């Protein structure tokens, strides 16, 4: 791997600018889920142990280059302080300029400084070299620990990395290692599970995966579009009929690449989309005209369990059915629990990512069993699509 980690850096007495992701959900000015804040703690603590002074750079919300009080990182300070008990955490009202410089100069060893929202400056999202230089001026070393923002070429993720000695933080390092194990140099056979509502939003992803994995499992509303493309009737199910030709092209590309596509063999159908709705399981081609497909059936789950059992690596993005509503979470839950079991038994390396996916695996009680769960959202998807991530590429310099 062409990037450095904290282990490669001499940080003693140095000001370390750390790009973190603390873009957490808030309600009435209070953090409602501090997961992202907790995930940066190992990097911050490692820098402190090595005698460095961590200065945190982050964005919050979409202020579009203006100062918006409700998007001030000052609101995140109490949760950050709570995540670092016994460490003094200060706040600077800007991320560049005189106030930021004064705050950095006043730091003592063992202290942490959080700078104000980088997106309060219009240049941040334009990757303005002057803004990147003003940020770089504050520190001696740059560490990127925000894989979730690595698909954006911004001043604080890409521009600054070209101006200072740079390394990946612990969270970024774990993410890159997990992703390399899943798609970079994976143990074969490799299975990808791709679910969700629409083929149109995952075209690049499917196009990249068929050339890189041995098995592609398609679930959720997307599977209906592939069934339609085969000439199968899906009743009132969610399906993108205008994407049928595209779906056929993906199937042809998979065949040419030696990738087996797995579609539902049987489906759970209902007349209404609500919890506990009356439902029945039918063959994939037998969906009644007035019903909609809301989950994969038990035959499909049994077939998938054989595919999973023969695999060595699995990548998961998107649920197999309408997992938010019982009983249409059954296929997702059963498949996720089996993957977790195989992973715990040492038979499988499993990596999952994307908002719905993380929610579905948590709901199934399977998340803990996966090798790695990426909370990165867009960056995880772009990586699965085979795109170069600017924030990672800049660390290779």
Swiss-Prot record:
One of its GO terms (cellular component) is cytosol. Substrate binds at residues 21-23, 36, 59-62, 119, 152. It catalyses: (2R)-3-phosphoglycerate + ATP = (2R)-3-phospho-glyceroyl phosphate + ADP. GO terms for biological process: gluconeogenesis; glycolytic process. Its EC number is 2.7.2.3. Pathway: Carbohydrate degradation; glycolysis; pyruvate from D-glyceraldehyde 3-phosphate: step 2/5. Its main location: cytoplasm. Belongs to the phosphoglycerate kinase family. HAMAP family: Phosphoglyc_kinase (MF_00145). This is Phosphoglycerate kinase. The gene is pgk.
